[in-house]
């Protein structure tokens, strides 16, 4: 008989009366009245093994096994006794009567129980091998595998070709910091690990491969958050001879296919499309969570002449904004709740949080409860009530500051209230999946510190045709053929139509204050390629880690990556990064300089 004939979790009634050979780990060993029960676990699940003292040698071995021992058992599949069926297990109607038990490898006492749900992340990542044995982690990584497989199936059927691009490439420091790799054979020179295969996939379109994809690692040396890692995985795609709408349709269908085939979720037949300007005006975010049924109300123009300087000063500032967020039934919120929200918005740069409770709308200002009402004239109060559509029992929150602070703080408050217990109880958040496309992004953003424009996405994104003239006259007005796919407040994919003409690419470089010599030095290979009849092309990249995190309902992408880094970009399992010896540094012509210690 083979070492293993079945997976533990797949032993069911169809094997009744048969002898099976199983391999796995001891989840739990229980001694009940002279009979030993072993819950045996493998990647497919659990099966109950019964060790009877009638087989003395086998029973003696069973007495010595402990949790996480790796064992092989051979035995007979039989029905469980009446009243002992476990409906929570696929194998819950049967058990295996053990005939032979072999310890393949003993285990030291594990540092934690695998069913402990209160482990610190440090413990989990330090002992990642054991952590990965837990059913939830097994589920997450198998889900990740299925998502990747379904993406490949769809793209293969659509004529895409899987082509690998280099991991050692040229550093082009535009945006996030590169991970640099010193070259031993070219002293003083460095490769960079790719932040994306962007330029290579464009070159593949020029090279007539028409439709490309790969599921690939990308690297960014940036500060980490719950949804960021220094190395992450993209489903990276590029296609020729398709317009923006056709590209969106193609990949919208791919995401629908993946969700249906992996978790049996039917996403909307057509994803709504929202311009960037509308998303910012209504939600303060370019990745709005449409499950939350709260929106901003614009009040900037109505607050220009009020005596309340907290409102009028930003209302009259060039980059200022005054916006309101009406919360239905929000009068139920206590002063403690409001104080908590006030402290919360300070995290996002807000100086405070003004509010008005609407007790009796018909009474006008006399029916309002707020410390700010006395500072507002009748016309401004009327504008607030009319524009917000406030009703008795509502509360209205206000943000007034630079537009970015208003958008960040009030946008975060919108999500916090919507997803709170209060929000759930009052229907302010809907369940399910709410996808959309956000389009018409600004082509450039102005960097005050460097006094120049920078690319909002990357410098290879095509401007909208009707905005080409603005590249040289008014870059700030230029909109891009860029699009992000957003799902439940997460950007899961982003892409654009690319620039395919050399003269347009050169104009974009000039708008970014990248001179001809610098452009040739950094991107000469691209500019040269665009002169050889480059086709119209565009593409998109999806964050595999983010998609799987959402599907799995995980708290962090670290829960869907086998061996992730911490928020300090460290691998606690292997203790990377780590020092290297002096000989290796000499071979790379590198001398370390100790970082300066802060002055006392």
Swiss-Prot record:
L-aspartate binds at residues 174, 220, 457, 498. It is found in: Cytoplasm. Residues 198-201 are annotated as: Aspartate. Gene3D superfamilies: Bira Bifunctional Protein, Domain 2 (3.30.930.10), GAD-like domain (3.30.1360.30), Nucleic acid-binding proteins (2.40.50.140). It comes from the Bacteria. It catalyses: tRNA(Asx) + L-aspartate + ATP = L-aspartyl-tRNA(Asx) + AMP + diphosphate. GO terms for molecular function: aspartate-tRNA ligase activity; aspartate-tRNA(Asn) ligase activity; ATP binding; nucleic acid binding. Pfam families: GAD (PF02938), tRNA-synt_2 (PF00152), tRNA_anti-codon (PF01336). One of its GO terms (cellular component) is cytoplasm. One of its GO terms (biological process) is aspartyl-tRNA aminoacylation. ATP binds at residues 220-222, 229, 491, 543-546. Keywords: Aminoacyl-tRNA synthetase, ATP-binding, Cytoplasm, Ligase, Nucleotide-binding, Protein biosynthesis. It is an enzyme of class 6 (ligase). Homodimer. Aspartyl-tRNA synthetase with relaxed tRNA specificity since it is able to aspartylate not only its cognate tRNA(Asp) but also tRNA(Asn). Reaction proceeds in two steps: L-aspartate is first activated by ATP to form Asp-AMP and then transferred to the acceptor end of tRNA(Asp/Asn). Belongs to the class-II aminoacyl-tRNA synthetase family. Type 1 subfamily. HAMAP family: Asp_tRNA_synth_type1. This is Aspartate--tRNA(Asp/Asn) ligase. It comes from Burkholderia lata (strain ATCC 17760 / DSM 23089 / LMG 22485 / NCIMB 9086 / R18194 / 383).
């Amino acid at each position: 008989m083979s070492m293993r004939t079945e997976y533990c979790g797949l032993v069911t009634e169809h094997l009744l009366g048969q002898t099976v050979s199983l391999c796995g780990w001891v989840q739990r060993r229980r001694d009940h009245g002279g009979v030993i029960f072993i819950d045996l676990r493998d990647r497919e699940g659990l099966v109950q093994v019964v060790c009877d003292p009638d087989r003395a040698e086998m029973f003696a071995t069973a007495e010595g096994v402990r949790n996480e021992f790796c064992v092989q058992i051979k035995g007979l599949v039989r029905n469980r006794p009446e009243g002992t069926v476990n409906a929570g297990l696929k194998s819950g109607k049967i058990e295996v009567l053990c005939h032979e038990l072999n310890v393949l490898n003993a285990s030291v006492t594990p540092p934690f129980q695998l069913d402990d749900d209160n482990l610190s992340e440090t413990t989990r990542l330090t002992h990642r091998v054991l952590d990965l044995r837990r059913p939830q982690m097994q589920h997450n990584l198998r889900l990740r595998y299925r998502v990747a497989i379904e993406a490949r199936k769809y793209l293969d059927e659509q004529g895409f070709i899987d082509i690998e691009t280099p991991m050692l490439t040229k550093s082009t420091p535009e945006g996030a910091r590169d991970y640099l790799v010193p070259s031993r054979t070219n002293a003083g020179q460095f490769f960079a690990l790719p932040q994306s295969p962007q330029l290579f996939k464009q070159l593949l379109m020029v090279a007539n491969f028409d439709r490309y994809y790969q599921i690939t690692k990308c690297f960014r040396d940036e500060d980490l958050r719950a949804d960021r890692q220094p190395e992450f995985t993209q489903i990276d795609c590029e296609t020729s001879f398709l317009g923006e709408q056709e590209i969106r349709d193609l990949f919208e269908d791919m995401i629908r296919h993946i969700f249906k085939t992996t978790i049996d979720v039917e996403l909307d037949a057509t994803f709504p499309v929202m311009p960037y300007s509308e998303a910012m005006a209504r939600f303060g975010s370019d990745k709005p969570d449409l499950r939350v049924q709260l929106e901003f109300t614009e009040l900037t123009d109505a607050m220009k002449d009020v005596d309340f300087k907290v409102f009028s000063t930003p209302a009259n500032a060039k980059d200022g904004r005054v916006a309101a967020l009406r919360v239905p039934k929000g009068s139920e919120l206590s002063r403690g709740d409001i104080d908590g929200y006030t402290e919360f918005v300070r995290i996002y740069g807000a100086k405070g949080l003004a509010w008005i409770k609407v007790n009796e709308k018909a009474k006008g200002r006399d029916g309002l409860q707020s410390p700010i009402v006395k500072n507002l004239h009748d016309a401004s109060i009327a504008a607030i009530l009319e524009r917000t559509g406030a009703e008795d029992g509502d509360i209205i929150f206000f943000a007034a500051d630079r537009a970015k602070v208003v958008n960040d703080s009030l946008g975060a408050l919108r999500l916090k209230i919507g997803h709170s217990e209060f929000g759930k109880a009052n229907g302010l958040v809907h369940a399910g999946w709410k996808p959309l496309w956000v389009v018409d992004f600004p082509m450039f953003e102005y960097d005050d510190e460097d006094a120049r424009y920078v690319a909002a996405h990357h410098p290879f994104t095509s401007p909208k045709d009707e905005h080409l003239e603005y590249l040289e006259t008014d870059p700030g007005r230029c909109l891009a053929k860029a699009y992000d796919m957003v799902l439940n407040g997460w950007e899961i994919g982003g892409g654009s139509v690319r620039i395919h003409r050399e003269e347009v690419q050169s104009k974009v470089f000039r708008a970014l204050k990248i001179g001809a010599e610098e452009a040739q030095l950094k991107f000469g290979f691209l500019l040269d390629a665009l002169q050889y009849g480059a086709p119209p092309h565009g593409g998109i990249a999806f964050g595999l880690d983010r998609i799987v995190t959402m599907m799995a309902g995980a708290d962090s992408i670290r829960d869907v990556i086998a061996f992730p880094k911490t928020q300090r970009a460290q691998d606690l399992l292997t203790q990377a990064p780590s020092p290297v010896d002096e000989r290796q540094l000499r071979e790379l012509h590198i001398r370390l300089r100790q970082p300066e210690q802060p002055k006392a």
